[in-house]
UniProtKB/Swiss-Prot annotation:
<dbReference type="InterPro" id="IPR011330">
    <property type="entry name" value="Glyco_hydro/deAcase_b/a-brl"/>
</dbReference>
<dbReference type="GO" id="GO:0005524">
    <property type="term" value="F:ATP binding"/>
</dbReference>
<dbReference type="Pfam" id="PF03746">
    <property type="entry name" value="LamB_YcsF"/>
</dbReference>
<protein>
    <recommendedName>
        <fullName>5-oxoprolinase subunit A</fullName>
        <ecNumber>3.5.2.9</ecNumber>
    </recommendedName>
</protein>
<keyword id="KW-0378">Hydrolase</keyword>
<dbReference type="InterPro" id="IPR005501">
    <property type="entry name" value="LamB/YcsF/PxpA-like"/>
</dbReference>
<comment type="subunit">
    <text>Forms a complex composed of PxpA, PxpB and PxpC.</text>
</comment>
<comment type="function">
    <text>Catalyzes the cleavage of 5-oxoproline to form L-glutamate coupled to the hydrolysis of ATP to ADP and inorganic phosphate.</text>
</comment>
<keyword id="KW-0547">Nucleotide-binding</keyword>
<comment type="similarity">
    <text>Belongs to the LamB/PxpA family.</text>
</comment>
<keyword id="KW-0067">ATP-binding</keyword>
<dbReference type="GO" id="GO:0017168">
    <property type="term" value="F:5-oxoprolinase (ATP-hydrolyzing) activity"/>
</dbReference>
<dbReference type="GO" id="GO:0005975">
    <property type="term" value="P:carbohydrate metabolic process"/>
</dbReference>
Length: 244
């Protein structure tokens, strides 16, 4: 069995360099919610050094709230903004001898695209326009995954080690109880259940079916690095290969 481990980088966390030794894919902030041209260059350089797949992490234009504010923008605006961000990272990667492999939206852009078909279409169309060979990463079973498949893109369905799930397989919103899993044992058990058995227990007790092709590790938690190391070790014990 194989699984991809991804982390969001270039967002001001001190643990970026160490996380890049543990993950197989890096989602690099492109300036709209965090980061700038220099952090993008630095993250790309470290990803290449560690053999980690380079990906763009586009967002709504929302640096004030770290890309976590809901926005209702016209699809053409989202298309242009997404194309702008992924095009910038693709060029930075190419200039350093690397290749951008995937795109994963950030924050509220990711969450809204999971449920809003027009928004999902705008993102998928931008990814396809930039490079049809790019992989589109989205929440397992979401509108974004469906949109990517409609454009013929390779998609990668994502699950979260440290997020609570609702009965329909969507994430518990961050402003609601149960959104974040603080207990390491619970997060580890949830991750293994999703990867090995394709299901997750919701906060209301029901089992939701999920397809786990990539697991997101958040680098901003207090014990993020320790958990990442433990997860890698557990995967190795279970014979699960970590690779993009």
């Amino acid at each position: 069995m194989k699984i991809d481990l991804n982390a969001d980088l270039g967002e001001g966390c001190a643990s970026d360099a160490e996380l890049l030794t543990l993950v197989s894919s890096a989602n690099i902030a492109c300036g709209f919610h965090a980061g700038d041209a220099q952090t993008m260059q630095a993250c790309v350089r470290e990803a290449i050094k560690n053999g980690v797949a380079i990906g763009a992490h586009p967002s709504f234009p929302d640096r004030e709230n770290f890309g976590r504010s809901a926005m209702q923008l016209p699809p053409e605006t989202v298309y242009a903004q997404t194309l702008y961000q992924i095009g910038a990272l693709a060029t930075i990667a190419r200039a350093q001898g690397g290749v951008m492999r995937h795109v994963k939206p950030h924050g509220m852009l990711y969450n809204q695209a999971a449920k809003e078909a027009q928004l999902a279409d705008a993102i998928a169309r931008a990814v396809y326009a930039c490079d049809p060979a790019l992989v589109l990463v989205g929440l397992a079973g979401s509108e974004l995954i469906r949109a990517g498949k409609q454009y013929g893109l390779t998609t990668r369905e994502e699950v979260f080690a440290d997020r609570g799930y609702q009965a329909d397989g969507s994430l518990v919103p961050r402003n609601q109880p149960g959104a974040l899993i603080e207990n390491e044992e619970q997060a580890l058990a949830q991750t293994l259940e999703m990867v090995q058995h394709g299901r997750v227990k919701s906060i209301t007790g029901e089992w939701a079916t999920v397809t786990a092709q990539t697991v997101c590790l958040h680098g901003d938690g207090e014990h993020a690095l320790a958990f990442a190391r433990r997860l890698r070790s557990t995967f190795a014990e279970k014979g699960i290969v970590v690779a993009a």
